[in-house]
Amino acid sequence: MESIPAAVVGQKINEWYRHIKKLNVTDAEMLREEIKRELDVMEEDEQAVLYFQLMDFRHEQMLEYVNPSQNQVNKADYLRAVEGEGKKLTGIMEYYVHFFKGMYEFSKGEYIKAIAFYRHAEKKLDKVADELERAEFYYKMSEIFYHMKQTHLSMYYIEQAYHAYKAHKANGMYEIKVIQCRFVIAGNYDDLCTHEKAIPHLKEAEESARNLGNKYMLAKALLNLGDSYKNMGDQDRALYFLIKAVDQAKESGAKELTQIYYELALLHFKKKEHESGKHYFELGVESAERFNDWFFTNLLNVLKLLYLEGAQPTAVADALEELDDIRGYPYLEELALVSAEFYTEIGHMDESVYFYNKMIYAQKQIRRGEFLYEI
């Protein structure tokens, strides 16, 4: 059989990547198999092989995103295949390598490592000609800065991603990307305590997700609405949206179901509705075990010690220590405040002061986060 030019295979990989970014699973799977067959008869080209390996890694990330309840293959294997040891990479390939490594580290909660890779990728962003591909990079930067509570940096990047995706919203292919951008925008507004600006974005996201029939995105929209109303102090509305989120998360197999149960348990416990709190706590533990979610297992453990097992201050303090890292600081801040208020209500002021100080410690660590990745 006559060999296939590497440029032809490269163009097919580009098309494959477009389907991956649009979450077109069926088309992406078909192209993946077609390209695999063509690689066997392609003219020798190291860059094309590396490009395929990178897209294969990105394909696995897409599958994990659209099927969060399923265990996927070890993505670290893909990264080891594209380390580039002894290989000279082009500018665009350097961009992809660092960008996808950043995504991988982010998925593990390694935010500082992820930012380091994203920064390397950003230096090669001028090699990326496609506006929507640059928007993907901007979105990922905004996402990680949001999780690190670096609100203004997150807003800087999300604005660029949002406008790029919204400009292409008419064909319906990038509606999900617009929804994702709205989640980040709303989360940043919540962190700025301007909740009235967050709610419209989340309601737009909810409506869009309903129109698309996307239960996973709808579950996230309802969860975020519940969280925003909780931050506003409107517990009844928060409960309303969180309860609605449960069904959508169950139907879509969303791992966010654990977070929804955690939020419901916390709200009921704070309202002194012990039995309801215990009910959702138990569901949360089940869900955390099913999804192997150690992070929310730690959060639920704090609720257990505080509300179900006698509120021993040393045990609660030890449980909060598990959240003493860059991913856990926002939750440490919230749960330390919850603990301080709990002990204030029962008249244990020494313990209350201790947990207030723990909250202040978490706030300081969040503020320090912006300096951790600077040289």
Show where each model-derived region lies:
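Flexible inter-repeat linkers and adjacent short helices
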Residues: 1-101, 281, 323-326, 331-375
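Helix-turn-helix repeat elements of alpha-solenoid scaffolds
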Residues: 20-36, 64-81, 109-120, 150-163, ...
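Long, mid-chain structured domain cores
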Residues: 56-156
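Structural register within alpha-helical repeat arrays
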Residues: 15, 56-58, 101, 141, ...
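Residue at a conserved register position within TPR or TPR-like alpha-solenoid repeats
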Residues: 19, 60, 98, 105, ...
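Flexible helix-coil transition and linker loops at the boundaries of alpha-helical arrays
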Residues: 38-49, 80-93, 124-132, 165-175, ...
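Residue register of alpha-helical TPR repeats
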Residues: 10, 51, 96, 136, ...
